[in-house]
Regions:
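Short, conserved phosphate-binding/catalytic loop or strand-edge motifs used
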Residues: 29-31, 35
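C-terminal accessory/tail domains of diverse enzymes
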Residues: 1-24, 38-237
Length: 237
């Protein structure tokens, strides 16, 4: 898929097809996003920047990726385990990498069932356009709403593109002073301050920021006791 009108139209048509047939997106259905690893390619600094960005804001992305639900799907931890705690513990090793190829060995977290799956990345030929050479975001819930898919795709691609020209001083500060253990409440609650930090870093226009924040906030609905996906009140037109 490319950022062209015809592809977005096809996406909308697929979602409408699923909606008409009442496709079940509540029970363990994931909406994984694959983005070509060639977006970062052989740019070592871009890879380092992206990992830092993802590590710092995984808890913000998690609520956003719940999509039109305000909770995660039931078996999320089984098939998309939060990866920020693992990445955080390997930051120093990652920073010492001198080539993109060496990243594969500096980060021994190559498990497909993590929220960020790097198993498909060809670290030996990161510029190749092979459709299998992808970075996979596994946290998103499935949805039959095309706007949710558009928002998710836009966020993932903007994160990767931004990483090629990102000043990481602020992220380094966050990494030095934050707590990156997994906590269900942290990954589900509304945190406006850090959500605003994220959108100001990642997006270069107000419309993208509004779409992200609207999907992230979801009428401020929160419930930390529910262990399954629950539809949020309508916030997407």
């Amino acid at each position: 898929m490319k950022d062209k009108k015809k592809y977005w139209k096809e996406l909308k048509e697929v979602c409408e097809f699923l909606s008409k047939r009442k496709a079940d997106t509540l029970h363990n259905a994931g909406g994984h996003i694959h983005v070509g690893a060639c977006t970062l390619g052989d740019d070592l600094d871009a890879w380092k920047n992206f990992i830092k960005l993802y590590t710092v804001y995984e808890h913000i992305l998690s609520r956003f990726f719940h999509g039109d639900k305000f909770t995660a799907r039931k078996r999320i931890l089984e098939f998309a385990e939060p990866v920020a705690p693992i990445l955080y513990n390997r930051i120093d090793a990652f920073n010492s990498s001198s080539t993109v190829r060496s990243l594969k060995w500096k980060f021994p977290c190559m498990d497909r069932c993590l929220s960020l799956n790097l198993c498909n990345v060809d670290f030996h030929k990161p510029m190749c356009n092979d459709k299998k050479n992808t970075i996979e975001f596994r946290w998103p819930n499935a949805s039959s709403n095309h706007v949710i898919w558009q928002n998710n795709i836009n966020t993932c691609t903007k994160m990767l593109n931004l990483s090629k020209n990102l000043d990481t001083d602020f992220l380094d500060y966050k990494l030095s002073n934050g707590n990156f253990t997994y906590d269900k409440m942290k990954y589900s609650e509304v945190n406006i301050e850090e959500a605003l930090e994220f959108v100001d870093l990642v997006f270069d226009n107000d419309l993208d920021k509004v779409y992200f924040l609207r999907q992230y906030i979801k009428n401020y609905e929160e419930n930390f006791k529910i262990n399954k996906a629950v539809m949020a009140k309508t916030f997407v037109r």
